[in-house]
Amino acid sequence: MVVKKTFVLSTLILISVVALVSTAVYTSGNVTFYSPSVNNQIYYVGKSVTIDAVVPQQFAGQGAVINLFFPNSTLAASIPTTVNATGGIYVPNAYTFPHVIGIWQITVEVTGGVAVGTIDVNVTTPAVAPIILTLQNLAMYENTYPQFIEFANGIITSVVMQNGTVNIMGYVYNSTVGPLSGATVSLTLNIPTVGTKTLSTTTASNGSFMLSFQVPQLSTTLTLISSYLISGSLTVSYGVHTVTYNVFITAIPNYLSVINALNNEVSTLRSEISSLNSTIASLNKSLANANTQISNLQSEITTLNSEIGKLNSTVGSLSTQLSSLSSQYNTLSSQVTALNGKISNLSTSLSTLNGEVASLRSTVSSLTTIAYGGIIAGIIGLIVAIVAIVLVMRRIS
């Protein structure tokens, strides 16, 4: 009976508390906050805050902005939103708090400053939050392939292949196996030929992290490739808590990479051989065409040689005729020379004859004058005779 009364009392108290919490509100200006619902409400690092507020319904449909300020009053984030039909502003998981402990300020403002409200939240860490890194959540991949990794007694050992990109992933949890957001994870490695390399990141909201680094291949000669050691440390920090793990990574020869490289070379050679075969086939075709052309040319040369032979024969005949003509020419030249001499003599004789003709013409001219005088005298004498005869005849009659 006592147990039943106690249970009933506890239930009533729980219901009262739930009712109290569910109806808690905080008003600032003309903005009523339902989440956060209490000024200086506590939020843990890595947790998100949902903004649930109400402004006068007259501002329904207008734009609004949610501003979050760091403890030092600098702006951390500005989230635009819109007032719904009932005057509500609701943004689930609006912002996840990073590892910045202190009093944050959240303001809700309708565009134009017609409605403004402010509420403070206390961002802190859980009272006890030791960091542990569990083995089952630690993994390593290289070029998308999972690699061997082991975590025991604060030492991380793994085996990777050379000449690849390694991604190491894991989760950071607190003592209650809850994910920690905003924890810093740093990986420091001493890599041969590279030196000391430090990588750093922060965990996501689910406590996950990933770091990437390159594993060099010290030699490209297959017979000289051998394993080597990469040593270093992995440090996880969250608030005042820090834990460090030793890291030993054995980089073994990446024969798969070498084989792939050789396969690529073989593929390249095959491609080149195929191209050469194509070129050879083209050259053979060109050679066949050239042989055909050569055969045609040889046939044409044979024909030309035959024609040249005929031409040579013709030339020989013409040479003979030319010799004969040359002899005749020489003979004719001699005759022409002789004729030229005769013509010269004839020219001389002709000149003499021309002189004689000129003299004769002069003589003939003189004789012609005398002859014309004699003729005229004869005619006159004849006329006189005729007249005398006529006169005699008249007398007789």
From Swiss-Prot:
Transmembrane parts of this sequence: 373-393
Cysteine pairings via disulfide bonds: none
Q: Does the keyword S-adenosyl-L-methionine apply?
A: no
Please state where this protein is localized: Secreted, Cell wall, S-layer; Cell membrane
Look up the signal peptide feature and give its range: 1-24
The answer to whether keyword Transport applies is no
Q: Which UniProt keywords apply?
A: Cell membrane, Cell wall, Coiled coil, Membrane, S-layer, Secreted, Signal, Transmembrane, Transmembrane helix
SUPFAM superfamilies, alphabetized: Bacterial hemolysins
> What GO cellular component term, any one, is given?
plasma membrane
Q: What induces it?
A: Constitutively expressed.
Q: Which residues form a coiled coil?
A: 259-314
The membrane-topology field of this record reads: Single-pass membrane protein
According to the lineage, what is the superkingdom? Archaea
Q: How does it assemble?
A: The mushroom-shaped unit cells of the Sulfolobales' S-layers may consist of three SlaB subunits and six SlaA subunits.
Summarizing the function annotation, the protein's role is: S-layer small protein. May anchor the complex to the cell membrane.
Q: What is known of its domains?
A: Composed of consecutive beta sandwich domains, a coiled-coil domain and a C-terminal transmembrane helix.
As for family, the record states: Belongs to the Sulfolobales SlaB family.
Protein name per the record: S-layer protein B
Q: Which organism is it from?
A: Saccharolobus solfataricus (strain ATCC 35092 / DSM 1617 / JCM 11322 / P2)
- Cite the source lineage: Archaea, Thermoproteota, Thermoprotei, Sulfolobales, Sulfolobaceae
Gene this protein is translated from = slaB
